[in-house]
Amino acid sequence: MHEMSIAMSIVDAVDAKARAEGAVRISLIELKIGKLAGILPEALRFCFSAAATGSLAGQAQLVIDEPDGRGRCSDCGHEFSVDFYYARCPECGSLRIVIVSGEEFLIQSIIIDEEGE
C-alpha cells in the first residue's frame, strides 16, 4: 500500500509550509488526484488519518478532487474520456493515444489557522 508513504509525504509538506507561515493548525487540505494517478482516494484518506496524528494536520479536513482521465488520439486528434491507459480511439480505432489529463497528483491548497484565530 503506497498510499501510506504518499500520506506521510503530504503531511510532511503541508506541515512544513504551515509552520513556515506561523500556523498553529491546518484546518483543510485540498488535493487533486486524477483517476489515472494510481492512487486510491479511500486508501489515502485512511492512511492520512494515521499519518497526520500529532501534526498540525491532525484535525484537518481532507478534500480530494478526482478529475477524469482524458486521452487524445495521435492519428485523428479526437479527445475523449479514458478509464485506463490502453484505450482505443472511439473515432478512428487507433491505439496511439496520449493521456492529456487524469494523472494529476498535487496539493491544491491548504487552509491554516494562526495563533489567536
UniProtKB/Swiss-Prot annotation:
GO biological process: protein maturation; protein modification process
Its biological purpose: Involved in the maturation of [NiFe] hydrogenases. Required for nickel insertion into the metal center of the hydrogenase.
Name assigned to this protein: Hydrogenase maturation factor HypA
Binding site for Ni(2+): 2
Chain positions recorded as Zn(2+) binding sites: 73, 76, 89, 92
Classification via NCBIfam families: hypA (TIGR00100)
Key words, A-Z: Metal-binding, Nickel, Zinc
Molecular-function GO terms, alphabetical: nickel cation binding; zinc ion binding
Lineage: Bacteria, Pseudomonadati, Chlorobiota, Chlorobiia, Chlorobiales
UniProt family annotation: Belongs to the HypA/HybF family.
